[in-house]
Curated annotation (Swiss-Prot):
This is Proteinase-activated receptor 4. It comes from Mus musculus. PROSITE patterns: G_PROTEIN_RECEP_F1_1, G_PROTEIN_RECEP_F1_2. Residues 60-94, 142-162, 225-255, 317-331 are extracellular. Residues 1-16 form the signal peptide. It comes from the Eukaryota. Residues 28-62 are annotated as: Disordered.
């Protein structure tokens, strides 16, 4: 599971090493002194002399406006080769299609069961919000899927591009923040069970959910305030978010995406690591009694780190070195890594909900239209476990 998720990071580094000093400097007026030739990833041009190397490497494919046309961007040949290759036009839509096909029914059914068949405990509210975030993420992907399948042609207009891009990032990072909130709730329940009786209430749970949603909305807000669609020079392609003017890269996109990666991913993952680390120590201290819960907790932590770390590391690397030649076209590796990150919304239902035998029984009872009384004994047992440190399901 780890290798496919780390592949975009390895791809980004290989792109940089393969291009070396032959990568066209996207900030300079490139003059060819020896002509062009085919490189490992497409046409490359040998540079005569870069005029400057002190500008930051941008987040997306950076383009220059065509003369007397503010709607059209020119991209270097190497960037166009990555933008129109098989990865963004075949692999990425396949991953998005998998998220829609699996994430919609899995999260929709889980949300239905949580809302109708599970006692309304504080942990239930957190898991319901997580299911909503993952469900909404799957719902906003079809426009992006159509865009990539059409060969990077956005047919829905500027406003739809802004909303779709902001919704993609907002719901994905909202899921990360809610995962951190769930880890805090489980830490209190398992490590401090007596104190949890006073702390784990509706007020704390509601506050955590509000903070997660408001933070995600704030982090995604810049994506709705600036233009995102531009025509690719020499083609009929209307790009959505994949190519942005050079003049806008450092002014607002750089700080916006640095904040998105740090506050929306690295800080929540750090909180999850601390909470689940303490939880794992508490479970390990009890020996084999809670071995299943121990393995499940480790799986939850590994899934979050493996899903979100590669794409956000690539995002930060874009700004880590002021020299454009340092990392090359890392955005070509970032696009598939972002698609891999969305797969977490398919994994969440199975490691948080369906892994529980009690939850599967509730799903079966609902699908078979069994009366609610058939699962009342299980509901009473779950409600009675509110003050315990461990219960057999994931619904703490």
């Amino acid at each position: 599971m780890c290798w496919p998720l780390l592949y975009p990071l390895v791809l980004g580094l290989s792109i940089s090493l393969a291009e070396g000093i032959q990568t066209p400097s996207i900030y300079d007026d490139v003059e060819s002194t020896r002509g062009s030739h085919e490189g490992p990833l497409g046409p490359t041009v040998e540079l005569k002399e870069p005029k400057s190397s002190d500008k930051p490497n941008p987040r997306g494919y950076p383009g220059k406006f065509c003369a007397n046309d503010s709607d059209t961007l020119e991209l270097p040949a190497s960037s166009q080769a990555l933008l129109l290759g098989w990865v963004p036009t075949r692999l990425v839509p396949a991953l998005y299609g998998l998220v829609v096909a699996v994430g919609l029914p899995a999260n929709g059914l889980a949300l239905w069961v949580l809302a109708t068949r599970v006692p309304r405990l504080p942990s239930t509210i957190l898991l319901m919000n997580l299911a909503v975030a993952d469900l909404l993420l799957a719902l906003v992907l079809p426009p992006r899927l159509a865009y990539h399948l059409r060969g990077q042609r956005w047919p829905f207009g500027e406003a739809a591009c802004r909303v779709a891009t902001a919704a993609l990032y907002g719901h994905m990072y909202g899921s990360v923040l809610l995962l951190a909130a769930v880890s805090l709730d489980r830490y209190l329940a398992l490590v401090h069970p007596l104190r949890a009786r006073a702390l784990r209430g509706q007020r704390l749970t509601t506050g955590l959910c509000l903070v997660a949603w408001l933070s995600a909305a704030t982090l995604a807000l810049p994506l709705t305030l600036h233009r995102q669609t531009f025509r690719l020079a020499g083609s009929d392609r209307m790009l959505c978010h994949d190519a942005l003017p050079l003049t806008e890269q450092t002014s607002h996109w750089r700080p916006a995406f640095i904040c998105l990666a740090v506050l929306g991913c690295f800080v929540p993952l750090l909180a999850m690591g601390l909470c689940y680390g303490a939880t794992l120590r508490a479970l390990a201290a009890n020996g084999q009694r809670y071995s299943h819960a121990l393995r499940l907790t480790a799986l939850v932590l590994f899934s979050a780190v493996a899903s979100f770390t590669p794409s956000n590391v690539l995002l930060v690397l874009h700004y880590s070195n002021p020299s454009p030649e340092a990392w090359g076209n890392l955005y070509g590796a970032y696009v598939p890594s972002l698609a891999l990150s969305t797969l977490n919304s398919c994994v969440d239902p199975f490691i948080y909900y369906y892994v529980s035998h009690e939850f599967r029984e509730k799903v079966r009872a609902m699908l078979c239209r069994q009366p609610e009384a058939s699962s009342s004994s299980q509901a009473s047992r779950e409600a009675g476990s509110r003050g315990t440190a461990i219960c057999s399901s994931t619904l703490l």
